[in-house]
UniProtKB/Swiss-Prot annotation:
IF-3 binds to the 30S ribosomal subunit and shifts the equilibrium between 70S ribosomes and their 50S and 30S subunits in favor of the free subunits, thus enhancing the availability of 30S subunits on which protein synthesis initiation begins. It is found in: Cytoplasm. Its main location: cytoplasm. The gene is infC. One of its GO terms (molecular function) is ribosome binding. Pfam families: IF3_C (PF00707), IF3_N (PF05198). Keywords: Cytoplasm, Initiation factor, Protein biosynthesis. One of its GO terms (cellular component) is membrane. InterPro entries: T_IF-3_C_sf, T_IF-3_N_sf, Translation_initiation_fac3_CS, Translation_initiation_fac_3, Translation_initiation_fac_3_C, Translation_initiation_fac_3_N. This is Translation initiation factor IF-3. Residues 190-212 are annotated as: Disordered. It comes from Mycoplasmopsis fermentans (Mycoplasma fermentans).
Length: 212
């Protein structure tokens, strides 16, 4: 028999001992053995005799509770979650800004920075801005983006081809290619690392461009 009315689904922290909202549960012992169906009261007493807790671990298709040290259980679970989180690679979206008439030196500076992002596993938005009458020459922008991609294609794939946005920006999206990245690392004796640094987005103002 279950409680009357619509029951608010409790969190795991609430579903222990006297807070278990069922009169009977299928009990699993402290060593993983199947005890069987008991009244919740009996199961709680059994747990207390062992100085442990009765924890509801499942409600479908039937209520299942396990006898364990809930404090230790929470600690171990938190520890595992933290370890799993640390193993995750944080993928960030970076940005590189260009202009159609960017000089060779500055293009190479941008490409080197882009390679740092790609080696960290980040995606890149390459945004080329047309200024003044440059918007009448979109082919210049495409040519610059093609040149930029050639400088980083040993690490990247084009995730999205160059597209004109608001008649002022030509945006292209790049993503790291794992096979290319691994090959590059081996060739350059680089150690893999997870990037947790702050946004490294670069604008043309961040580099010393030569006179055009």
């Amino acid at each position: 028999m279950q409680p009357q009315g619509k029951m608010k689904k409790p969190t795991a922290e609430h579903m222990i001992n006297e807070n278990i909202p069922f009169q009977k549960v299928f009990v699993i012992g402290a060593n993983g053995e199947k005890v069987g169906v008991l009244s919740t009261r009996e199961a709680i007493e059994m747990a207390k005799e062992q100085r442990l807790d009765l924890v509801l671990i499942s409600v479908q298709p039937k209520p299942i509770a396990r006898i364990l040290d809930y404090g230790k259980f929470k600690y171990e679970r938190k520890k595992k979650q933290k370890a799993a989180k640390e193993k995750q690679t944080v993928i960030q979206n970076r940005q590189i800004r260009l202009t159609p008439l960017i000089g060779e030196h500055d293009l190479n500076v941008k490409a080197r920075k882009a390679k740092e992002f790609l080696l960290d596993g980040d995606r890149i938005k390459v945004s080329l801005k047309f200024r003044g009458r440059e918007s009448a020459r979109p082919e210049l922008g495409h040519k610059t983006l093609e040149k930029f991609y050639k400088a980083v294609e040993d690490l990247a794939d084009i995730a999205k081809e160059a597209e004109l946005v608001n008649d002022r920006f030509l945006d292209m999206y790049l993503q790291p290619n794992k096979i290319k990245v691994n090959k590059y690392r081996k060739e350059h004796n680089l150690v893999d690392k997870n990037s947790d640094s702050q946004d490294k987005s670069v604008s043309e103002e961040d580099t010393n461009e030569g006179e055009q």
